[in-house]
Amino acid sequence: MTSTSRKSSCSEVRIPLTISESRFDINATVRDNWDAVSLTFNLTSRVFNTPDDPLPIAGGLGEKVTSNYTVAASLCGTGSTMIITTHGIIESRRYFQPNLSDSAQYSFVDAAVAAGYSVLNYDRIGVGESSTINSSTDAQFQVEVNVLNALVTYARETAHAEKVVLLGHSYGAYISALSAAATTSAVDALVLTGFSGTLQYFAPFASGAGFRVARLQDPARWGHLDSGYLTTSDVYALTYVGFADPYFEKRMAEWTFAVACEPFGVGELPTLLATPWAFGNVTAPTLVLQGRYDVSACGGDCVGVLDTLAEDFTAATVLETVDDLPAGHDLFLHTIAPQVFDTIFGFLSEQNV
C-alpha cells in the first residue's frame, strides 16, 4: 500500500513482514517511573552485566516465535542504489528527514535523493507508524535485525534496487552492522554513525537520559503503549545525550524532543547486550562517522576510540573512520550535517555504489 507524501519525491509505504526469531525472556518489570529509575540504576552500576548485577534476562534464547508486523516507511527517489536508514533509541525516522521549517540542510533523505540515490526510511517496529508491539517480548534486538534483513529483501525483490546500502545511527547502527553480517551478498556498503563498537560508555547515556515511562510522560501521545516503553525526561536530558554545544541550533533539540523523539521498549537494550556482535562477518565496505563529543558512543570524546574497530571488522573490504567531527551523538542534527552527507556520498562513490 502506498500514498504520496508531502514531499514530491517520496511515497509512504506500509510493508507487511512475517518474522520468525527466537526471543529472550526479559525479567525487568516497569510499571511506573520509580521502576524506570531502579532499572536505570541497575543498567549503570559499576558491576552491571556481572554475576553481581546480571542482565535482566532469564536464561538464553528460546524457541523461534513467528510474528507479523507492518513497517511504515518513506520510499524516496528513483536511484538504482537504495539506502536503507535505521534510526536509534528515543528516535524515529524523522531523524533522517526533519519536517520543521528551514531544515533542509539537516535532511539526509533529501540530500541522498539529490545525489541520485533512493532511500527507504523506516520506523523500527514499536515506533511511530509501524506496528505497536510488546515492549518485552517483541522489542528485542535480534528481532529488529531480522526486520532489517527482510527490508533488504524488500529493497532487492520488490523495489528492484540494484545495490543496497545500510545506514544505521546509534542503536540502529548495531542493527545495521549485524544485518550486514547476516546478508553479506545483498549489502553493498555500510555506514554507521553514533557507533563505536563498544558499550563501555553506555552508563552516561542511560543515566543522563532520565528514563521515564512514556505513557505517563505524555498520555495523549503515548497512552496506547504498555508501561515498558521508556522515553527521556525533558528536552535538556535529550540535549545532554544527543547534542554538543556550540555545534547545534537549539531549535533542532527542541523539535527532536517535541516531534521526532519516540519511546523504546524495555527489552531492546538488554537483548543488544546479550547478542554476540558478529562484526567480523561484515564484508561490505564500511564507513564509521562520529561526532567527537558523542556521550553514549565515546563518553564525550571520540578521538582514538574508533582505532580498535579494525580488529572487529576484519572481513570488510574497506574500513574508514572519522572520529573528530564537531558534533554530539545526533550527528545529522548538527550544523556540520551537509559536510557529513558529502563525506558519505563521496565514500559510496569511491566504492562504486
Where do the protein language model's features map onto the residues?
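N-terminal cap/lid segment of alpha/beta-hydrolase-fold proteins
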Residues: 2-78
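Alpha/beta-hydrolase
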Residues: 54-55, 205-301
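Short, surface-exposed "cap/lid" segments of acyl-processing enzymes
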Residues: 78-117
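Glycine-rich "HGGG/HGxG" loop immediately N-terminal to the catalytic nucleophile
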Residues: 94-95, 123-138, 329-330
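Alpha/beta-hydrolase active-site loop
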Residues: 137-159
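Conserved hydrolase catalytic core segment
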Residues: 162-198
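Conserved loop-alpha-helix segment in the C-terminal half of the alpha/beta-hydrolase fold
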Residues: 292-322, 327
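Catalytic active-site module of serine/aspartate enzymes centered on a nucleophile-bearing elbow/loop
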Residues: 318-353
